[in-house]
UniProtKB/Swiss-Prot annotation:
Pfam families: Phe_tRNA-synt_N (PF02912), tRNA-synt_2d (PF01409). CDD domains: PheRS_alpha_core. Mg(2+) binds at E254. This is Phenylalanine--tRNA ligase alpha subunit. Keywords: Aminoacyl-tRNA synthetase, ATP-binding, Cytoplasm, Ligase, Magnesium, Metal-binding, Nucleotide-binding, Protein biosynthesis.
Amino acid sequence: MQELIEKIRQETANFEITDKDSAEAFRLKFLVRKGSIPQLFEQMKTVSKEDKPAVGKLLNELKLFADGKFKEAMEHIAANELAADDLADLTLPGRTHFLGAEHPVQKVLGDMKRIFQKMGFSTATGPEIERDAYNFTLLNFAPDHPARDMQDTFFIKKEADAEDVVLRTHTSPVQIRVMLEQAPPIRVICPGKVFRNEAVSARSYCVFHQLEGLYVDKGVTFADLKSTIYSFARQMFGSDVKMKFRPSYFPFTEPSAEVDITCYLCGGKGCRVCKHTGWLEILGCGMVHPNVLRNCGIDPEIYSGYAFGMGIERTALLRYNIDDIRLFFENDLRMLSQFE
């Protein structure tokens, strides 16, 4: 019996396991129920009582040896397979990584910010949920001004005995916050998201983006405002752009104006985009109203300033000849992929 055990031990030791097939052959020959080693355990009943301890010890050692060899071989095979999977064929082309593209609205906003930053403007932001005081009162809006009506503004809270809370309708409240916190000179742009209770159409949306600018210092004049707007328009729309200022009205500026540029599509000759006028409106502006300066603790007898504001989506519509503002909010890759 001991000679048979030694013979099978030699067979297990000499058996080469190089892959899964040879490992399975080893298992079937030595380890399964009808394999060589289990069959030796079946023959233990024929061993004399005196020899059983020694034979049993040899059998247990044989089984441990065979099990260990099989386990070690399987681990080695698995490690080799894993290493083979990790091998890279350096002759193959690399995998293409599809990166997202900057949204056209953000492209335009980024260009605007860079232009004004070169002029010395810093950037300020503020909350999108705003108090009535910052959104209307301190900006010289009369109590019965149409903009305060629920038909034009989204109210978060509207109570008779408490201050209204609204979704800001412009980024002008940021200018108020800056003037309340900072002494002149002030030169700042205020980009951000604004909200209007308007019907959604190809030309209007209930959410859009604005960029407003403010400059307050001693001796600021309308000529300074015109110079700033001219410089911006030439850098944004081209050096050959023509401009005109039209008188307008805003509660927070006096005098006020709206600025038109020659239609960049038709060169001022008239087309569908400019409604055959040859001109496109790009922004509103004016000299900061003395009441607004007083509301912010700035003496209008000493300081003056100008402010301007424009819609980012509107500028993007003009720049990219897009005819529907809703496309900016639909995340349609067929449209957005054109700006990669």
